[in-house]
Amino acid sequence: MASAAVANYEEEIVRPVADFSPSLWGDQFLSFSIKNQVAEKYAKEIEALKEQTRNMLLATGMKLADTLNLIDTIERLGISYHFEKEIDDILDQIYNQNSNCNDLCTSALQFRLLRQHGFNISPEIFSKFQDENGKFKESLASDVLGLLNLYEASHVRTHADDILEDALAFSTIHLESAAPHLKSPLREQVTHALEQCLHKGVPRVETRFFISSIYDKEQSKNNVLLRFAKLDFNLLQMLHKQELAQVSRWWKDLDFVTTLPYARDRVVECYFWALGVYFEPQYSQARVMLVKTISMISIVDDTFDAYGTVKELEAYTDAIQRWDINEIDRLPDYMKISYKAILDLYKDYEKELSSAGRSHIVCHAIERMKEVVRNYNVESTWFIEGYTPPVSEYLSNALATTTYYYLATTSYLGMKSATEQDFEWLSKNPKILEASVIICRVIDDTATYEVEKSRGQIATGIECCMRDYGISTKEAMAKFQNMAETAWKDINEGLLRPTPVSTEFLTPILNLARIVEVTYIHNLDGYTHPEKVLKPHIINLLVDSIKI
């Protein structure tokens, strides 16, 4: 929300500038070049390991439990993108055969994997583990692996899966009790899962943790899969570091740190977000476009949130709506800098996509950006007027200011297979997108409430909720948490087949929700204060390679 201007514009303008910390990274990521000999060596060995892994997947006569565990391991190791068709075919066969199993571990794993791949397997698979009163049998308390898989499965639940509400409560209680007494690496796996469930985690973060902290220490590990995963992670990391260097140079050339010192300098954290949306090599162009967009809208956000005056922000909003470089003279000098940079960026996007005949799709992202800025301006007006809207009015405006409609649309720009129809579907705010946006809004609002309150912002989500319902801060936060849980069920339903667009275009929407869960974990604002949350993830993904 925007900061207030003074009533009399003839007087010196007082700007209640937020005291954002500088970047943690300096010029650390400014230069990186892939060592071609190393990359070629890795790629050659990966091809051989890929063939061995494919043979494992396609081997006949495997038990159901072994097949499911192999798929789960491949996915957790971050190498499943090499075998999407093979894995989908195997799971399709398992689903259509209505394969059944009697142990909790296999049943729960089967349920989660099928649901995550869009197969609407019935939760009745768990009824055999309940007693005559409909409660999970206490005899399961000693089956830690079974409980762990049940816990992970409970997070893919939809609105109709009441049994999984019980599963979550039951597995959580018993895992918390068992964790201190477990041997390594199972202890670390259980502790980590209770902190961050797999389904809501950022895929690359979860992969790095699983490779280094779990699978590498397992006695029963498959060394082919482990080496494949390590080589593949390091090879991809080279590409990611090269992209980050490219983006860092672009950011340094813009020199916003000097010219717009009121704004957060978070280009590395923005790259982490883009990497969270998609990490695979085929999305390199998409990642670079997305990180530039996130970095730029962050500057605009801080302009509204922590610097601009009412008149300035109205002029800026109007200029963005007109989207015309000739409007620049109507803006104060500091706003001209970001305005020109934004228009230049979208010209670059159009030029970049023109070679593939796709420059026309850029207009979808531009329209979403205009929407964000209009809604930023509404929030700034509320702040000036001291207006606390009803929750419904607040959310109708604040969902767009999450930027998630905008970022989801932008995430499609560099995806070469995205068609006009995919953008049209997204423009109608389908339920799965709406759910991802709601998750971002309520989690962000909960994490940033105290800071915003201290800055005098009264039209916050939590404040609106408290006033609307006559409830306490704690109760309002619980209400927002319930909204997030409901939205996760909507996302999980939206992933089930048949889907209106391919899974490729649903995954970025899912991953945007995952990113906000990770960034704001424990009600911490990991974007504004990355040292609290994101720094160790960035080091693991973009600084330290995995020892081979």
Curated annotation (Swiss-Prot):
**BP GO terms, sorted:** diterpenoid biosynthetic process; sesquiterpene biosynthetic process
> What post-translational changes are documented for it?
Self-alkylated at Tyr-520 in the presence of (2Z,6E)-farnesyl diphosphate ((Z,E)-FPP). Self-alkylated at Asp-444 at warm temperature (42 degrees Celsius) in the presence of (2E,6E)-farnesyl diphosphate ((E,E)-FPP).
A Pfam entry, by short name: Terpene_synth
Which parts of the sequence bind Mg(2+) 2? D301, D305
Which reaction does this enzyme catalyse, per its entry?
(2E,6E)-farnesyl diphosphate = (+)-5-epi-aristolochene + diphosphate; (2Z,6E)-farnesyl diphosphate = (+)-2-epi-prezizaene + diphosphate; (2Z,6E)-farnesyl diphosphate = (-)-alpha-cedrene + diphosphate; (2Z,6E)-farnesyl diphosphate = (-)-beta-curcumene + diphosphate
> Remarks, anything else?
PubMed:1438319 indicates the presence of at least two genes coding for the same protein.
Write down what this protein is called: 5-epi-aristolochene synthase
Q: What's the source species for this entry?
A: Nicotiana tabacum
**The organism's taxonomic lineage, starting at the top:** Eukaryota, Viridiplantae, Streptophyta, Embryophyta, Tracheophyta
